[in-house]
A protein has these predicted regions:
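Short coil/turn segments at secondary-structure boundaries
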Residues: 18-24, 109-112, 172-175, 192-199, ...
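A short glycine-rich beta-alpha junction/loop motif
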Residues: 73-80, 105-126, 245, 260-268, ...
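Non-catalytic DNA-recognition/assembly elements of restriction-modification systems
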Residues: 1-37, 124-133, 140, 146-189, ...
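A short beta-sheet element
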Residues: 33-99, 103-104, 205, 225-227, ...
Length: 345
């Protein structure tokens, strides 16, 4: 194994930074920073253009890696430009290898010190290239599958509009009612800091709430004593709706069967009355119509929030219950197709 600094070096000093105020939507050269998007802006500037490509970009705060193969400028602070020291390693191989390293999340701090502790295997260049080809083939297959899954999601949205109409215009004249009156319970998770442990009962936060599913590969835990204490506030049950209400606001999913967990404050819980079915509620909340309400009511700060008082002011609509059941059948059928694609293809 070879240490990181024997394989790569930090060449950030030779890359010119462009202020965010100088980003353009179009231009000759891309501006790369540590954010989630590959390219965050463009410029027609030439002075300071970094041309010694390829390079690997590392986000010192975000822990993101990017492989850049065309001349570029860098954006905000925290964008590291990493170069290989020799031709013994292939850039794409190193990039894929780095993507699969576990770099600790220490919040909005610098993380490059952890990257410098990474060790690389000593593998013949030809074998590296062979591995890269297989990984790229796999990535293409994954991209094709993901595109199909996205098209199935679009199909669900289309059926939602067909059954319930254009709610912006309320073409079917459904009753429009605040969530405060549609729900029998609206609350959120524990406000004080729970005592966490290494294993036990799930403690969910906003990062664990995705649209239509839970993300449990990066989750905290509490023990039975802490669970009992927090449960005095609320005990989540199957069919409740979970809504992320801090940071990335507005993601939601239905609580599935047979899962025991508690919540922190960044997750809201909505328990609708019997005239609103959970699956319908989930797709109503993720609709563009409802998300616009959320965006208009969430607090504008460095970290957006949408707490109980504002959640109660959000408005839903109440379609015929039999139409809701018909929609549930559609969702279940499409989810079966998704399952087949994920498992067997």
């Amino acid at each position: 194994m070879k240490m990181f600094l024997d394989v790569m070096y930090d060449d950030t000093k030779n890359a010119r930074k462009v202020k965010s105020s100088d980003y353009n939507n179009e231009g000759k050269y891309p501006i790369i920073d540590q954010g989630s998007k590959l390219i965050y802006g463009y410029t027609d500037e030439l002075d300071g253009l970094y041309t010694d490509v390829p390079v690997i970009i590392f986000g010192d705060h975000t822990r993101r890696f990017k492989l850049i193969e065309e001349p570029f400028f860098i954006g905000a602070d925290g964008t590291k430009v990493l170069k290989l020291r020799s031709l013994a390693y292939d850039y794409k191989f190193i990039y894929y290898y780095l993507l699969h390293q576990n770099i600790p999340d220490t919040g909005y701090n610098r993380h490059f010190k952890w990257v410098k502790e990474i060790e690389f295997p000593e593998i013949a260049h030809s074998i590296q290239c062979s591995i890269v080809k297989k990984l790229e083939l796999l990535n293409n297959l994954i991209s094709t599958k993901n595109e199909l899954l996205r098209s199935l999601d679009v199909l669900i949205k289309s059926r939602f509009v067909e059954l319930f109409g254009d709610i912006d215009c309320n073409t079917k004249n459904w009753p429009i009612i605040t969530l405060e009156n549609l729900a029998e319970l609206i609350t959120d998770g524990e406000h004080s800091t729970p005592k966490r442990c290494n294993e036990g009962i799930y403690l969910l936060s906003a990062r664990n709430i995705l649209n239509h599913s839970l993300k449990l590969d990066d989750v905290d835990y509490i023990d039975e004593t802490e669970y009992s204490r927090i449960s005095k506030r609320v005990i989540p049950k199957a069919g409740d709706i979970l809504l992320s209400c801090s940071g990335s606001v507005g993601r939601c999913c239905v609580v599935p069967l047979e899962i025991k967990f508690q919540l922190v404050r960044s997750v809201a819980l909505i328990r609708f009355k019997s005239d609103i079915t959970p699956i319908f509620a989930e797709y109503m909340i993720t609709s563009d119509w409802f998300q616009r309400q959320i965006n208009s009511l969430k607090t504008a700060s460095s970290q957006a929030n949408l707490f109980q008082g504002r959640i109660k002011k959000l408005k839903g609509f109440v379609p015929d219950i039999y139409l809701q059941y018909e929609f549930i059948k559609v969702v279940n059928q499409i989810n079966k197709l998704k399952f087949v694609q994920i498992v067997y293809n």
